[in-house]
Amino acid sequence: MAQILAASPTCQMRVPKHSSVIASSSKLWSSVVLKQKKQSNNKVRGFRVLALQSDNSTVNRVETLLNLDTKPYSDRIIAEYIWIGGSGIDLRSKSRTIEKPVEDPSELPKWNYDGSSTGQAPGEDSEVILYPQAIFRDPFRGGNNILVICDTWTPAGEPIPTNKRAKAAEIFSNKKVSGEVPWFGIEQEYTLLQQNVKWPLGWPVGAFPGPQGPYYCGVGADKIWGRDISDAHYKACLYAGINISGTNGEVMPGQWEFQVGPSVGIDAGDHVWCARYLLERITEQAGVVLTLDPKPIEGDWNGAGCHTNYSTKSMREEGGFEVIKKAILNLSLRHKEHISAYGEGNERRLTGKHETASIDQFSWGVANRGCSIRVGRDTEAKGKGYLEDRRPASNMDPYIVTSLLAETTLLWEPTLEAEALAAQKLSLNV
């Protein structure tokens, strides 16, 4: 149903009886009638909204084409190649036709793009090569069409600087790591902004809602804004084959979270990046801006993180709590390395307030959300389980964070002296 905004002066327009606008079928009809009453000159010109109903309208025709199912007529499919852009957080994509449905990334051709237009290559040598790495079903086009997560390489076969997947894949392929079957559960927080003013969804423009408290997991038109986007994203992820495990409204109004996992090794990064892509596309269609800024609003408002839950096979087995404590000890000794890799602008979020630890001080605790590393009460009670790294920012790269956790806890060995000092400082009896 399209709409026409009509000015107030008296006017009447009738579509001729035999006009081409009129569909021959009795099912289809179209008429435009604009009528206004005379108003005195001293009155403001008013407007009336009148409906233009037409199954043959431009909008309907475009929607019909968008919803076309090509499967009965062709084996060819559309593959949307997706990659990470020059900022390390922006996503890019483009489409190509593939002759038949595929089941594995190895069946797909490599492709290329203009890296000088994404900040990833100089103009005189701009070609960057896309290597297909993971396939997901396309919830926007349906059918056998697919989304393809790619990483980025030079023509000579070297990963470009923004390709963090390559190093992560190398770490996860190490037998010491793969043998421990590392699981990751990633909690992606994000904030929805009004398109034209870049202010949180549901907030009065240039002003603030009531203080935090009623919004976390809240219900009601005065507490929650953006649920349709969250739900649409949830279903799109399930359709795509992403291992999404839940969603919830967050502490700051206009902020949401989705969880991915548990996923093994490199899959965690692939699934989070594809989930982010779907969210970007859905907010694009909704006319809402998505931001992963770790502190979108200064002041007494929660920031946005990407808490990462982590366990290994040894942690999940009997006696695993001792393995968890050893992992925490290692993480404490590489705190600076992790912080430097955990997202841009994280110093604005990790202040020691709003359920965060100080960025300058490593800490751990049971059920304590003000620590760097949190251990759940179930894990403590059972003597096995997982740990939660609460330091990563919402704009972190999941390839970096997951592989660094595996590297620090499974491949890196501190000196005995450093280990003893750290254990004493953290009250860890390892």
Curated annotation (Swiss-Prot):
Expressed in mesophyll and epidermal cells of leaves. Residues 161-430 form the GS catalytic domain. The keyword Membrane does not apply. Residues 77-157 form the GS beta-grasp domain. One of its GO terms (cellular component) is thylakoid. Pfam families: Gln-synt_C (PF00120). It comes from the Eukaryota. One of its GO terms (molecular function) is mRNA binding. GO terms for biological process: ammonia assimilation cycle; glutamine biosynthetic process; response to cadmium ion. Residues 97-122 are annotated as: Disordered. The modification Phosphoserine is found at S106. PROSITE patterns: GLNA_1, GLNA_ATP, GS_BETA_GRASP, GS_CATALYTIC. Its EC number is 6.3.1.2. Induction: By light, sucrose, glucose and fructose. Keywords: ATP-binding, Chloroplast, Ligase, Mitochondrion, Nucleotide-binding, Phosphoprotein, Plastid, Transit peptide. Disulfide bonds: none annotated. It catalyses: L-glutamate + NH4(+) + ATP = L-glutamine + ADP + phosphate + H(+). InterPro entries: Gln_synt_N, Gln_synt_N_sf, Gln_synth/guanido_kin_cat_dom, Gln_synth_cat_dom, Gln_synth_gly_rich_site, Gln_synth_N_conserv_site, Glutamine_Synthetase. SUPFAM superfamilies: Glutamine synthetase, N-terminal domain, Glutamine synthetase/guanido kinase. Residues 1-45 form a transit peptide. It is found in: Plastid, Chloroplast; Mitochondrion. The light-modulated chloroplast/mitochondrial enzyme, encoded by a nuclear gene and expressed primarily in leaves, is responsible for the reassimilation of the ammonia generated by photorespiration. Homooctamer. This is Glutamine synthetase, chloroplastic/mitochondrial. It comes from Arabidopsis thaliana.
